[in-house]
């Protein structure tokens, strides 16, 4: 399955629901979904796999409401991408940055990815059990 295309479609759906779409307030540097979409396009277009100090580029002041189920769908696809990756896990890889950008829309604390989806879901459930359950359901559905 093409999880990268799934992510792009997921981001389009989220953006289509946003009241800022195609306005002067629509700026990927200030929007977590816009940032994540930008990173995914760079994976595809430029074969970029890591961004030095990339975590500092993720918008920290995006307080828009995002549908929890749509975010869970994106995170599930990212977890599948991470599982398929053979580059070795690090927090500046584009997959981790995309995941973190989505997490910031739903979770108040930074979430570490331990390299295993089960442990990750356990960590997410400590902050937001309903999000962990949605991620798990989508992860199983697309797998």
PLM regions: where:
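Cysteine-centered metal-binding/redox modules
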Residues: 1-143
């Amino acid at each position: 399955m093409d999880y990268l295309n799934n992510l792009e479609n997921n981001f389009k759906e989220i953006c289509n629901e946003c009241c800022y779409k195609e306005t002067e307030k629509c700026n990927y540097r200030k929007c977590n979904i816009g940032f994540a979409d930008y990173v995914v396009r760079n994976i595809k277009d430029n074969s970029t796999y890591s961004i030095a100090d990339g975590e500092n580029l993720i918008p920290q002041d995006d307080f828009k409401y995002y549908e929890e189920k749509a975010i869970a769908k994106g995170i599930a696809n990212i977890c599948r991408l991470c599982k398929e990756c053979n580059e070795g896990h690090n927090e500046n890889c584009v997959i981790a940055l995309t995941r973190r950008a989505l997490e910031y829309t739903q979770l108040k604390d930074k979430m570490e990815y331990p390299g295993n989806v089960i442990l990750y879901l356990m960590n997410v459930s400590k902050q937001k059990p309903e999000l962990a359950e949605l991620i798990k359901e989508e992860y199983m559905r697309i797998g």
